[in-house]
Amino acid sequence: MLQGFVQIALILAILVATAPLLGRYMARVFLGQSTWLDKIARPLESLIFAGSGITKHPSMGATQYVSAALISNLVMGVFVFLILMFQGSLPLNPTGLAAPSWDLALHTAISFVTNTNQQHYSGETTYTYFSQAGALGFLMFTSAATGIAVAIAFIRGLTGQAIGNFYQDLVLSITRILLPISLVGAILLLVAGVPETLAGPAQVTTLEGATQWIARGPVAHFEIIKELGENGGGFFGINSAHPFENPNNFANLLETVIMMVIPAGLIITYGIMAGNPEQGWLIFWMVFILYGILIAIAAVGEFQGNPLINQILGETQPNLEGKEVRFGWVLTALWAVSTTGTMCGAVNGMHDSLMPPGGFVTLSDLFLQIIWGGQGTGTAYLFVFLILTVFLTGLMVGRTPEFLGRKIEKREIVLASLILLIHPIAILIPTAITLAFPDTLAGISNPGFHGISQVAYEYASAAANNGSGFEGLADNTLWWNLSASFSLIAGRYVPIVALIFLADGMARKQPVPETSGTLHTDTTLFTGITAGAIIILGALTFLPILVLGPVAEAFNLV
Amino acid sequence: MIRNFVISLRSTALLWILTALIYPAIVLVIGQLVFPYQANGSLITDSQGQVVGSALIGQTFTEEGYFWSRPSAINYSEGADASPTGISGASNLAPSNPDLLSRIEAEAQRLEDNAVQPTADLLYSSGSGLDPHISPAAAQAQFDRVAKARSIPPQELQSLITKHTEGRFLGIFGEPGVNVLTLNLALDNR
């Protein structure tokens, strides 16, 4: 057990060392300062801007920004939906796959354009190499870039600057951040053993004479952006547990760190862009502590294993159901907390088979949305919580709440509440409907309390734009594809629209001069109160589900 | 509105060329030219040069003279169900599911009938259904059976197991695992 926690501590140390580096770099990129990539990236960007018809980069107003984000996402989504529907006639289809059902293709397109990558299919049996690399891999870049662009716009607005130009930030996110890191990472994964080929599955005769089909494909380039962009949609059905996606512990270490490095780094980016690095670090450590607690809960649960199975083994052994030997209990638990916290959604072990503490933690991650949080959006949600905490504490002491020298008024609170409330609406209402029809709609595969977790997890994963699942659930049905699509869209675009209007409104306010009565938000006390507010608001909303699901299951196992 | 639409169409096309065409092509060329073994799936051959599998993908073993792999929910992508694409998958059984308990009871019985002391990894099914490894303890639990079936001196078998055990990365990260396929192939090739 000690060795396991040493592994966790070292990986977290690597994160703490690398995230600020990337955070500082991202700040340089979006502040328009020079970086060492200028020589290669600038001509490429000029080409893209000229070819797209973007000659100047004036800052957009909120309405303009929102319509640019929504229209471009719509165009990309429709484009990908068409590729998926016509994949049977497109090249790079060595196994002769036909088009998927329209509802599955629709769910897939929405799921990838929203940076969720919830998959109601297995990659190797459903989508061609062209669909995976040409359609889904494309959205992995643009959906992540959309998230980063929105986060940067939000940070700018909060700190009183104009929110910027959506297209410019979208392109810069790809050419300066996502693509260069992916290129290096893909080559590292290649060396580690991740395939990159257009050849079809290898058909071999095993040592005992059976015929084995080994699925392959252009995986390495897909795998790295899957983690870096917090997309999480596996090339293969079983995602990063598959030895071709995650062959050894070098690959696993790289993938674990790289999925967290952008959301963790963006908090530091904020501190720099706001001219208050201290505030960035305070928030960073707040998230880090919450993250550490959740890791400990999940890891201990997996280490203690399943009491029913331990009786057969005659001793306490870790729970290894749905886990790979090479990762063991500790790296699977760490990954599970990280992937649900960051809204990556890739898995290196099956969440459905996690012990109840693991189910509790992964669900809590999806409910809170800020344990690093989604690509860009997670950082923005953190500030929404800061704004709400300013409001709450302002009410307590009877002052007009201010954040970063700007008054928090009705409009800000309405928009912040909308961001906060859309999450339970997109989770709890469809969960209730689905659970009302357990035989026809739900598709539950595990009996008892765990079945409730399966359904709630699927909608929570969709609404949080995570994409992982309790994958026993029979979810490739018309109901699941369409109802999860509702949660995907509501969980993505309602907050994005609200965030942009919130930021734009803040940017246009007259700054209030600082007085002796100003509440400082860059203190440990205030950060602690924020953590409390996050936990209380999350718990008040979702505790019933957690009690009915993993908590009840835990008591049932003893 | 219309202007946004036109810009979106054009930027989508250009970003598509960059991220879905140029980027994968670069990685593909590097993979095929510089790392062809890994890029094509780490396929390995027997002494006759016949491809027998991938060093990264496990297989089913039932014979006395082979080390056995972990339980797989998809039968290691073997047989008609896996044709033609290959498959991956897990049981997705919850810890509280009675099916998990009964499956593991049966598996423990089967192992004990074959004089193998069950270890956790030999009872629990893997995540991918393709796990190439078993734990060193699971290899030791099968040591006597394989040694007897092949009449191989214990020291030689032990050194083969050690040779096909992948340790932790940098001695720290992950868990050690014995690669079942490469070990069994080495046994065949002696």
Swiss-Prot record, chain A:
Membrane-spanning residues where? 2-22, 66-86, 135-155, 177-197, 253-273, 280-300, 327-347, 354-374, 378-398, 413-433, 482-502, 528-548
One Pfam family per UniProt: KdpA
Query: Could you tell me the keywords of this UniProt record?
Result: Cell inner membrane, Cell membrane, Ion transport, Membrane, Potassium, Potassium transport, Transmembrane, Transmembrane helix, Transport
Q: Is Cytoplasm included in the keywords of this UniProt record?
A: no
Q: How is this protein situated with respect to the membrane?
A: Multi-pass membrane protein
Where does the record locate the signal sequence feature? none
Instruction: Indicate where this protein resides in the cell.
Output: Cell inner membrane
Q: Which molecular-function annotations from GO does this UniProt entry contain?
A: P-type potassium transmembrane transporter activity; potassium ion binding
Cellular component GO terms held in the UniProt record:
plasma membrane
* The keyword Cell inner membrane belongs to this UniProt entry's keyword annotation: yes
GO BP term, pick one: potassium ion transmembrane transport
Domain of life (superkingdom): Bacteria
Family (UniProt): Belongs to the KdpA family.
Assembly and partners?
The system is composed of three essential subunits: KdpA, KdpB and KdpC.
Q: Which PANTHER family match?
A: POTASSIUM-TRANSPORTING ATPASE A CHAIN, POTASSIUM-TRANSPORTING ATPASE POTASSIUM-BINDING SUBUNIT
Give the protein's function. Answer: Part of the high-affinity ATP-driven potassium transport (or Kdp) system, which catalyzes the hydrolysis of ATP coupled with the electrogenic transport of potassium into the cytoplasm. This subunit binds the periplasmic potassium ions and delivers the ions to the membrane domain of KdpB through an intramembrane tunnel.
Protein name according to UniProt:
Potassium-transporting ATPase potassium-binding subunit
From Swiss-Prot, chain B:
What the entry lists under InterPro entries is as follows:
KdpC
Q: Which GO terms describe its biological process?
A: potassium ion transmembrane transport
Topology relative to the lipid bilayer, per the entry, is:
Single-pass membrane protein
**Which chain regions cross the lipid bilayer?**
15-35
Which is a Gene Ontology cellular component entry for this protein? plasma membrane
Q: Does the keyword Cytoplasm apply?
A: no
Q: Which domain of life is it from?
A: Bacteria
Which stretches are annotated as coiled coil?
none
Q: What does this protein do?
A: Part of the high-affinity ATP-driven potassium transport (or Kdp) system, which catalyzes the hydrolysis of ATP coupled with the electrogenic transport of potassium into the cytoplasm. This subunit acts as a catalytic chaperone that increases the ATP-binding affinity of the ATP-hydrolyzing subunit KdpB by the formation of a transient KdpB/KdpC/ATP ternary complex.
The record's section on HAMAP family has: KdpC
Quaternary structure and partners: The system is composed of three essential subunits: KdpA, KdpB and KdpC.
Q: What is this protein called?
A: Potassium-transporting ATPase KdpC subunit
Q: What is the organism field in this record?
A: Synechocystis sp. (strain ATCC 27184 / PCC 6803 / Kazusa)
Q: What is the lineage of its organism?
A: Bacteria, Bacillati, Cyanobacteriota, Cyanophyceae, Synechococcales
Gene behind this protein? kdpC
